[in-house]
Amino acid sequence: MRAFLVLGMFTASLSNAAWRDYQEARDLALDARGVNTVEIVTGAGSLEVRGNPNARKISVTAPIQVPGKNEEKARKVIESRLVLTLERDGDSAALNGYFDSSRWGWGGSPSVRLEVEVPESVGLDIQDGAGSIKIRGVLGDIIVEDGSGSSMVPARSL
């Protein structure tokens, strides 16, 4: 009887470990001199943009979550489906942070949360798929196209 109880507890703990979410974070940065607008395209996950009067670069921290996958499988999902780029295009910077959804798979949807710091004077052009948006301290023009989720832009950011 004890053997069955121990075996049951061992099996339950293994199945619990197998279904934990995999998490990692990535960082991006780009010199912001001459950048007037930051164009941001996101998918599932929240977006937070903070304007900083002393910032000389655009800094991004991107916590990534892949639910229900062990590390090896999660890394395969990240390598094959994650789009995470920060590039300059003239006087604009383009930030893309999302998982390519054209490839369907089992399990929960992976997400990438974007935490972005920009010079306070830049404008923002945001296309958001799903998730909350918080913008504060940004003095430039702000355009938001939001698929779903809440948006918060304090009056001083307008």
Task: Indicate residue ranges for each PLM-predicted region.
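Hydrophobic h-region of N-terminal signal peptides that target proteins for export
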Residues: 7-17
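Sec-dependent signal peptide recognition
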Residues: 1-7
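Acidic (Asp/Glu) and glycine-rich low-complexity loops/linkers
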Residues: 16-128, 136-145, 151-158
